[in-house]
């Protein structure tokens, strides 16, 4: 983990622990580069396929005290109550925001979606 990633989570130890667990699962897919920005951490293979942030994608009263938002880029929309928000950012590219409150949410369904996003990011245009 880079110093920039650690700095992103400064003062947020619960979110850092969740990010570490998430990143471990994602890196099992293959080569991943994490690039920390001011408002998000982009996860890339050939292209950005996912981002991690603490954006408020739901009203504050509906969000847990500690959470991460995992944003996935996919070719098709997902239909699940776990998706907090989704939009077709451009034709054939759907952006999905998923609120994660704990490592127990890193389940088979989520890992399948991450795998789809990883493959989508790694495709040839």
Annotate each PLM feature.
Residues 1-4, 8, 25, 34, ...:
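Generic, low-specificity signal for short hydrophobic/alpha-helical stretches with a mild N-terminal bias
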Residues 89-125:
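Well-ordered alpha/beta subsegment
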Residues 18, 22, 48, 110-113:
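Amphipathic alpha-helical interface surfaces
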Residues 31, 75, 122:
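Residue-level marker of positions within ordered structural domains that often coincide
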Residues 1-24, 29-36, 40-41:
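Charge-rich, low-complexity N-terminal segments
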Residues 1-2, 12, 87, 111-113:
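Short linear sequence motifs
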Residues 16, 54-69, 105-111, 121-125:
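Short, Lys/Arg-enriched charge-dense amphipathic segments
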Residues 36-95:
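Short, conserved beta-strand/beta-arch hydrophobic-aromatic motifs that form part
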């Amino acid at each position: 983990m880079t110093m920039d990633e650690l700095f992103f989570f400064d003062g947020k130890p619960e979110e850092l622990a969740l990010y570490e667990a998430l990143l471990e699962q994602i890196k099992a897919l293959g080569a991943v580069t994490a690039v920390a920005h001011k408002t998000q951490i982009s996860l890339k293979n050939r292209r950005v396929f996912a981002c991690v942030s603490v954006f408020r994608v739901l009203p504050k009263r509906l969000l847990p005290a500690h959470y991460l938002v995992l944003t996935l880029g996919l070719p098709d929309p997902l239909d699940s109550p776990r998706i907090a928000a989704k939009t077709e950012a451009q034709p054939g590219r759907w952006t999905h925001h998923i609120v994660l409150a704990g490592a127990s949410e890193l389940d088979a369904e989520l890992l399948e979606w991450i795998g789809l996003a990883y493959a989508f990011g790694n495709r040839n245009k």
